[in-house]
């Protein structure tokens, strides 16, 4: 990639390490202040051994090489995506002790172990988003031997109803179903109660009419078939997102076009799955900054950054978390937070998998198990279609 080549040229050709130091300190100062960096201010803060004139000369060279750009209003310099990449590559993850304690306290909101694995991962993403004050997404495989524990029906209008199906592992499946006719008042609630009793193997309500029971069975079988279709045949990991509105607090995303680019990328399942899977076996955070996202996003210059890190069960990667933000992220703190977060999550997931004997499978566009052993996959979902005689 062109960006990587330019950086390697900087490393290979630098005759004076002070140029590199000026770049790192200018980027650091910009991240701290959010303002263009002038030579005098940099001299007063981090480069007292260099004169303003020398710093300006270094600025000019860095600007020529594409690492800094001049602010036409103040005359100060602003780091480019290449500068942020260089900074991210040359600074180890770092957290103050107070930050570590605060994060550890926040992580106590997560359970020690749980069978409700998907719900817990969703909770973990909420906690991470709250810690970083950034949008978070994560990919997840499909967990085997799941079972439906609740069914809800919500009327949209006279002929359509939303069917909400939730599972023991925390999966939520929704779909829209058409009703053959308008139902009397409270009829939908009675059908919902009948289906919930059926799941729990409890006696049905005597107030339910035969017509309502028959309709409930038809709706149940329809939604189960749709659920099993999605469960058995999936070509991408399940993807979950939270905290998108947190982008609005950053100056970069107050520009509608930049905000639209960032959200469009985060909402694109194909792009996000591709990005999250890129370094699935790398246990440390990976940053994709600015133009490095171009090949995936498809536009000219997404002015944002995505940082990913896989999460593990023992030594096996299950998926990855991704954080979306502006290019001027505090990379050291974000890297440190992600590492601390996934270390804790690894302990929770490992305990949960061994305690409850959980298993999972990954997506495949042409999963041979889906075509050769559909009955086995259907059984592992713990959802069974009603026998035909129960529909009569």
UniProtKB/Swiss-Prot annotation:
Q: Which UniProt keywords apply?
A: Repressor, Stress response, Transcription, Transcription regulation
Q: Name one Pfam family in it.
A: HrcA
One GO MF annotation is: DNA binding
Secreted listed as a keyword? no
Q: Give the domain of life.
A: Bacteria
Which Gene Ontology biological process is one annotated for this entry? negative regulation of DNA-templated transcription
Q: What does this protein do?
A: Negative regulator of class I heat shock genes (grpE-dnaK-dnaJ and groELS operons). Prevents heat-shock induction of these operons.
Its family? Belongs to the HrcA family.
Q: Which NCBIfam families match?
A: hrcA
Official protein name in the record: Heat-inducible transcription repressor HrcA
